[in-house]
């Protein structure tokens, strides 16, 4: 068992671990070690710096509108379903596959939810469970063709995109269906209750954000200590501290902005919980290491004893569930299901993962990177809309950003 775990760990090529390459030695000067580490991990630090730079740019060009509490709340609500799907898409890409059907599945599940709750008056809790199980079944069907029948994921999910786009039209009969029950709408339109109010600031939301930041810092520190105890190389202490303090500061600052409006949205709590769950799964569980091993070198992973077919199958089941959840969140936000819901979502989700550092060849990517990538896309969309940039040029700019991100990844890999 220990040898197998060691073999799995050795197959992970820069995925969830974030370990530095062996370009330095303990005897190397501190400055040289820092420079070498930054050179080999520029992707990780570049993502955070890029997000901060983009936010600063649009904050000043929009005369401060971008970081107004109302607009920050809208940013969270507008990008929540993209972030949710990006978590699943990251695992699919890391495993060496792609899923083009997530947008159509998202729209189909929203349509199914509308028919169940509005037309058949099914209790919203039961309807949500049915929709999530439907997403799992869709992922299982596509996963079987990909993992066991060996049909390329591009073809299977392209077919799925067409099938579920058509099924959404059929279920809705070409019309919009709504409104949803008020309880269901709270998924996207509700905010956590506030037990304290101080000069217009929802103190409960702010304190919760501060607690989340503190928990993140402690978790990262414990993870670092655990890796060091196993003799694995880690990033220099000052870089580790600076990066995580920056993340914590951003969380606290955004919590303050949200608390200055209506508080933390319910969907942000769902999204944050999923982020923590998937970050833990990819960094500290056996199945997480095996997914990175599968994407890094499928043949070697199979020889090491990993059941690669079953792992790929469950990766798509997971993607189906998250696409269904995103469909419910999006439908609740619109308060109606439309035949065009989910159109083009898969492009934003895939772009978020690649911009966030996932490798097109598989085996590389981080949860926090996918989330940052999603918010880079969201901030760009929001900022350009505030500035009055047309949708045509918005698409051009987003395409260029995606191409640049993938080019940098390929360039660094070929150096």
Question: Which residues are covered by each model-predicted region?
Answer:
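Transmembrane alpha-helical segments of polytopic membrane transport and secretion proteins
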Residues: 1-45, 218-249, 410-415
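Membrane-interfacial amphipathic/re-entrant helices at transmembrane-helix boundaries
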Residues: 21-84, 120-126
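Single transmembrane alpha-helix segments in multi-pass membrane proteins
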Residues: 55-120, 142-154, 169, 282, ...
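Inter-helical junctions in multi-pass inner-membrane proteins, predominant
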Residues: 63-74, 169, 173, 255-268, ...
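Transmembrane alpha-helical segments in multi-pass inner-membrane proteins
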Residues: 97, 316-329, 333-396
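Alpha-helical transmembrane segments within multi-pass membrane transporters and channels
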Residues: 121-162, 372-373, 377
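Transmembrane helix-bundle core of multi-pass membrane transporters
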Residues: 164-282, 339
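Membrane-helix/interface signature in polytopic inner-membrane proteins
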Residues: 220-234, 276-316
């Amino acid at each position: 068992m220990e040898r197998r775990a060691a073999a799995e760990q050795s197959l992970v090529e820069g995925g969830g671990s974030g370990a530095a390459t062996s370009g330095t030695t303990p005897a190397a000067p501190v400055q040289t070690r820092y420079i070498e580490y930054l050179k080999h991990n520029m992707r990780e630090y570049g993502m955070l710096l890029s997000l901060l730079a983009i936010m600063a740019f649009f904050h000043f060009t929009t005369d401060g509108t971008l970081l107004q509490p109302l607009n920050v709340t809208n940013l969270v609500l507008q990008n929540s379903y993209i972030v949710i799907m990006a978590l699943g898409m990251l695992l699919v890409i890391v495993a060496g596959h792609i899923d083009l059907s997530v947008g159509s599945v998202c729209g189909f599940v929203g349509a199914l939810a509308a028919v169940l709750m509005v037309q058949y008056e099914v209790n919203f809790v039961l309807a949500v469970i049915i929709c999530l199980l439907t997403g799992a079944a869709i992922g299982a069907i596509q996963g079987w063709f990909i993992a066991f029948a060996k049909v390329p994921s591009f073809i299977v999910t392209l077919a799925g995109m067409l099938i579920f786009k058509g099924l959404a039209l059929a279920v809705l009969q070409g019309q919009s269906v709504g409104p949803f029950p008020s309880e269901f709408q709270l998924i996207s339109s509700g905010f956590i209750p506030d037990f304290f109010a101080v000069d217009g600031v929802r103190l409960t939301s702010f304190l919760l954000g501060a607690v989340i930041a503190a928990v993140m810092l402690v978790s990262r520190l414990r993870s670092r200590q655990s890796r060091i105890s196993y003799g694995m190389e880690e990033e220099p202490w000052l870089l580790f501290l600076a990066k995580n303090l920056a993340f914590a500061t951003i969380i606290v600052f955004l919590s303050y902005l949200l608390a200055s409006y209506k508080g933390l949205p319910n969907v942000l709590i769902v999204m944050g919980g999923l982020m923590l769950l998937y970050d833990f799964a990819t960094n500290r569980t056996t199945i997480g290491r095996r997914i990175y091993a599968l994407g890094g070198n499928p043949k070697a992973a199979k020889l090491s004893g990993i059941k690669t077919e079953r792992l790929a199958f469950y990766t798509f089941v997971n993607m189906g569930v998250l696409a269904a959840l995103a469909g419910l969140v999006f439908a609740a936000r619109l308060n109606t299901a439309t035949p065009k819901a989910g159109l083009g979502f898969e492009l934003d989700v895939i772009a978020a993962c690649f911009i966030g550092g996932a490798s097109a060849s598989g085996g590389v990517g981080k949860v926090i990177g996918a989330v940052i990538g999603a918010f880079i896309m969201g901030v760009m969309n929001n900022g350009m809309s505030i500035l009055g940039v047309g949708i045509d040029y918005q698409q051009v700019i987003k395409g260029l950003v995606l191409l640049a991100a993938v080019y940098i990844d390929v360039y660094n890999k070929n150096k």
